[in-house]
């Protein structure tokens, strides 16, 4: 256990060489990262890459089969799931949603809803909320009990571009107001929240890590989407020293092929290096669009997504 303290930048959770084995197959292996108080860490990768698995291992929902996870003693976690099973035919108000996991003082409920910008919707039925409003309700539910660590599993899914910007702005506000650490999971491989301190690209292991390039540096992006978008979103450029083959094996830069990519095999040096918080570690080069188990990465950026849809 990590020792309790109130200092800013205090480490909340740390993963060291973590692996999760299920059905004779490694879902993730050799995963290393940490989240400190006031820090935002974003996990990106294709579907099935181990993002949610790694996050669940970090907060103790999954027990790793190898490696070590250390957490702050008495760590309080707020969790916004990727999907929430709700019977939409039954009436469920925002107020009731806030107390599904237990009673909550009225003052704390009101404060959380106010922080999420939906205090006026406390009596609304959740099935009538838009995608963005529902995500705000889930976020209010997660922060109501004042967590040290906030885990957000694809929080901007089902919202349009402007809604995505607004939600990222909300996440930033929550971090600034509470000082909590944030572990954010995203399926978007190239466009991430600009306030992210560290981006970690996963595909069964840590493929690369670094800091995002601020979109605000691109005049074209600012002209197209405005300064608020430029201040909220950022571009992350990948640097992989290996290629994932269609059969799941890994082709390394030296021409060798292995069944997986693991720090101990000597091919993946940067996995074992701890990324310094705040260090400028941007990898600028073209990202191969078919290097993750044969998945096609050529997907639309955030600005070309369809309009706001229903929540999951």
Curated annotation (Swiss-Prot):
The gene is znuC. Belongs to the ABC transporter superfamily. Zinc importer (TC 3.A.1.15.5) family. Residues 13-228 form the ABC transporter domain. The complex is composed of two ATP-binding proteins (ZnuC), two transmembrane proteins (ZnuB) and a solute-binding protein (ZnuA). Residues 243-312 have a biased composition (Basic and acidic residues). InterPro entries: AAA+_ATPase (IPR003593), ABC_transporter-like_ATP-bd (IPR003439), ABC_transporter-like_CS (IPR017871), Metal_Ion_Import_ABC (IPR050153), P-loop_NTPase (IPR027417). Its EC number is 7.2.2.20. It catalyses: Zn(2+)(out) + ATP(in) + H2O(in) = Zn(2+)(in) + ADP(in) + phosphate(in) + H(+)(in). One of its GO terms (molecular function) is ABC-type zinc transporter activity. It is found in: Cell inner membrane. This is Zinc import ATP-binding protein ZnuC. It is a peripheral membrane protein. It comes from Rhizobium etli (strain ATCC 51251 / DSM 11541 / JCM 21823 / NBRC 15573 / CFN 42). GO terms for biological process: response to zinc ion. GO terms for cellular component: plasma membrane. PROSITE patterns: ABC_TRANSPORTER_1, ABC_TRANSPORTER_2, ZNUC. Keywords: ATP-binding, Cell inner membrane, Cell membrane, Ion transport, Membrane, Nucleotide-binding, Translocase, Transport, Zinc, Zinc transport. The keyword Lipoprotein does not apply. ATP binds at residues 45-52. Pfam families: ABC_tran. Part of the ABC transporter complex ZnuABC involved in zinc import. Responsible for energy coupling to the transport system. Residues 241-312 are annotated as: Disordered.
């Amino acid at each position: 256990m990590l020792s309790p303290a109130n200092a800013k930048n205090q480490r909340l959770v740390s993963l060291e060489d973590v692996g999760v084995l299920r059905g004779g197959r490694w879902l993730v292996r050799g995963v290393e990262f940490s989240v400190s108080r006031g820090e935002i860490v974003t996990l990106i990768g294709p579907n099935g890459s181990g993002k949610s698995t790694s996050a669940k291992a970090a907060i103790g929902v999954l027990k790793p089969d190898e490696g070590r996870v250390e957490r702050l003693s008495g760590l309080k976690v707020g969790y916004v799931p990727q999907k929430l099973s709700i019977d939409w035919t039954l009436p469920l108000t925002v107020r009731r949603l806030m107390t599904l996991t237990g009673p909550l003082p009225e003052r704390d409920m009101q404060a959380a809803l106010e922080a999420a910008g939906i205090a006026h919707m406390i009596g609304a039925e959740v099935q009538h909320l838009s995608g963005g409003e529902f995500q705000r309700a889930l976020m209010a539910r997660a922060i109501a009990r004042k967590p040290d660590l906030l885990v957000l599993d694809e929080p901007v899914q089902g919202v349009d571009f402007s809604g995505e910007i607004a939600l990222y702005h909300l996440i930033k506000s929550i971090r600034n107001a509470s000082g909590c650490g944030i572990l954010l999971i995203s399926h978007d491989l190239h466009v991430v929240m600009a306030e992210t301190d560290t981006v970690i690209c996963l595909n069964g292991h840590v493929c690369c890590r670094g800091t995002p390039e601020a979109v605000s540096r691109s005049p074209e992006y600012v002209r197209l989407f405005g300064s608020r978008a430029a201040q909220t979103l950022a571009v992350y450029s990948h640097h992989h020293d290996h290629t994932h083959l269609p059969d799941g094996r890994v082709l390394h830069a030296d021409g060798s092929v292995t069944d997986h990519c693991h720090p101990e095999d000597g091919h993946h040096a940067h996995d074992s290096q701890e990324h310094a918080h705040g260090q400028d570690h941007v990898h600028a080069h073209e990202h191969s669009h078919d290097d993750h188990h044969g998945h096609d990465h050529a997907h639309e950026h955030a600005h070309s997504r369809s309009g706001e849809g229903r929540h999951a």
